[in-house]
Amino acid sequence: MSKVGTSDSKNTLYCSFCGKSQHEVRKLIAGPTVFICDECVELCMDIIREENKSSLVKSRDGIPTPKEICKVLDDYVIGQNHAKKVLSVAVHNHYKRLNHQTKHSDVELAKSNILLIGPTGSGKTLLAQTLARILDVPFTMADATTLTEAGYVGEDVENIILKLLQAADYNVERAQRGIVYIDEIDKISRKSDNPSITRDVSGEGVQQALLKIMEGTVASVPPQGGRKHPQQEFLQVDTTNILFICGGAFSGLEKIISARGRSTSIGFAAQVLAPEDRRTGEIFRHVEPEDLLKYGLIPEFVGRLPVVATLEDLDENSLKKILTEPKNALVKQYQRLFEMENIELTFADEALGAVARKAIERKTGARGLRSILESILLETMFDLPGLEGVEEVVISREVVEGTARPLYIYADRSDRAVESSASA
């Protein structure tokens, strides 16, 4: 049994779980007869999160409830509540539909594939990746920009089903109940409204190829990839019950929506007259199928995506939360890097706000946060390994704005705060 240990000479306290001394950890929390360090507390929290994730509350059909799916999404994805609700309900209904079909074959429910529309860095891909972690079904992601029509250089559409089959360990039955996320779907829009003698093999051609597998067909899938092994036997995979989620930034779609608003006399026209004064995500809320057609998606393809969820631009508060709250938050990652040098990295709240505002100004969303932090911390990370006695580095708003340098706090408190290399 682990005992609370104290050094005979210095009365040093030790963690009752890992045995580290109070000098090796940041915090040592005292109980009636035991001590626990901050590292063990964090480890316990990780274990509890994993157990909660794996024990989702089930509905009567044995399917995770929409609220439970949404709750787990909340743990990883900041904001985008509407999109999370749409995804949670769609995934729940998808598997409820499959169970319903097996019990009542006389009633056939149509499949509702999903289209996610949102600005760059708003969380479309992260939502799909998080779904993969919380659902016990095969899941795969595909990049629409790599797809071409069969017979041309690039990936065949059937390769998407092959990846799903691989995710299911070649269990065809499981693969037929999986989920496919196709990213950058806006990049396969038709290049021109006018028919051309030049075949559009990566735009409209890919849309045509995707139609059948999205609606439901028996696809012949080569287990090793068809182009390199043409003589192999094909596996037959029915795509009727595979849920397809497509996502894209649809850059320029907001102009089409705004133009439609200016040409109509209905009430919401006044709301879109000045798109430069509004954020892209707000304009996306008013998207209609006709806007997607003008953007370059063919009518049949739009019809295969009946559920449209729009994501909003992330505001300053959401970006600040993204920096600090998720399990793998960027600030936590950089703090871990500094811990390897036995240095504590501290961000002032105003500094986090300044980082968020920079990302908003650049219109890069959450995707641009890492590059901003990297540029702020570059000189510090360059200097620190060669310095001795630095205990803490403090990042203020002025540091982010470029008007000051990070503060170095030394172990010798008589010279408590020293500006970085500028004062050296």
Curated annotation (Swiss-Prot):
Any coiled-coil regions, as ranges: none
One GO BP annotation of this record: cell division
Q: Which residue ranges does the record assign to the ClpX-type ZB domain? A: 3-56
Positions annotated to bind Zn(2+) = C15, C18, C37, C40
Q: Which SMART domains match?
A: AAA (SM00382), ClpB_D2-small (SM01086), zf-C4_ClpX (SM00994)
Q: Name one GO molecular function term.
A: ATP-dependent protein folding chaperone
Which residues are noted in the entry as ATP-binding?
P119, T120, G121, S122, G123, K124, T125, L126
Which keywords does this chain's UniProt record carry?
ATP-binding, Chaperone, Metal-binding, Nucleotide-binding, Zinc
- Please give the GO cellular component terms listed in this UniProt entry: HslUV protease complex
Signal peptide coordinates: none
Task: List the Pfam families hit by this protein, alphabetically.
Answer: AAA_2, ClpB_D2-small, zf-C4_ClpX
Q: How does it assemble?
A: Component of the ClpX-ClpP complex. Forms a hexameric ring that, in the presence of ATP, binds to fourteen ClpP subunits assembled into a disk-like structure with a central cavity, resembling the structure of eukaryotic proteasomes.
> Which family is this protein grouped under?
Belongs to the ClpX chaperone family.
Protein role? ATP-dependent specificity component of the Clp protease. It directs the protease to specific substrates. Can perform chaperone functions in the absence of ClpP.
Full protein name: ATP-dependent Clp protease ATP-binding subunit ClpX
Q: Which organism is it from?
A: Bradyrhizobium sp. (strain BTAi1 / ATCC BAA-1182)
Q: What is the lineage of its organism?
A: Bacteria, Pseudomonadati, Pseudomonadota, Alphaproteobacteria, Hyphomicrobiales
